[in-house]
């Protein structure tokens, strides 16, 4: 995922090409939360990142059966902290990730904080 901030300090995000300089900050929320790379292959089955954040859904690593919810939530919180520090106005998130999708844990937390989330393939 990448957080983006217009270098001019203007608000809003323009998808695609722009004449305004953009600062991209690449992040890996799961890694920020303490997970190794590569990580386990958990998915959001039967819910969304909102369900995880609200305590209605847990993320279980299929390879080990371990609950890895705390890593995703912790990573999302660290990502939000960084986004707020740099004044990010939008985030480009990888589609299909339980964390880095618009409907994933990080995507949902960023949207709740008013940061525009753009899903990329």
Where are these regions (language model features)?
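Divalent-metal-activated hydrolytic enzyme cores
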Residues: 32, 50, 54-77, 104-121
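Short, charged beta->alpha transition segments
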Residues: 76-84
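Catalytic phosphate/metal-binding cores of nucleic-acid and nucleotide-processing enzymes, i.e., regions
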Residues: 4-10, 89, 113
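Short catalytic/ligand-binding loop motif for oxyanion handling, primarily in non-cytosolic enzymes
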Residues: 35-36, 99-102
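Short, surface-exposed acidic-centric catalytic microdomains
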Residues: 6-62
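Short, well-ordered beta-to-alpha junction loops that form the rim of enzyme active sites
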Residues: 94-98
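Charged helix-capping and loop-helix junction motifs
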Residues: 8-11, 103-107
């Amino acid at each position: 995922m990448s957080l983006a901030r217009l270098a001019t300090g203007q608000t809003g995000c323009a998808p695609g090409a722009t004449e305004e300089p953009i600062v991209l900050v690449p992040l890996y929320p799961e890694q920020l939360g303490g997970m190794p790379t590569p990580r386990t292959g958990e998915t959001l089955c039967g819910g969304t990142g909102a369900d995880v954040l609200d305590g209605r859904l847990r993320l279980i690593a299929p390879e080990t059966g371990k609950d890895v919810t705390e890593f995703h939530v912790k990573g999302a919180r660290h990502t939000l902290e960084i986004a707020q520090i740099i004044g990010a106005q939008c985030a480009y998130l990888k589609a299909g990730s339980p964390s880095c999708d618009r409907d994933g844990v990080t995507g949902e937390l960023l949207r709740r904080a008013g940061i525009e989330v753009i899903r990329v393939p």
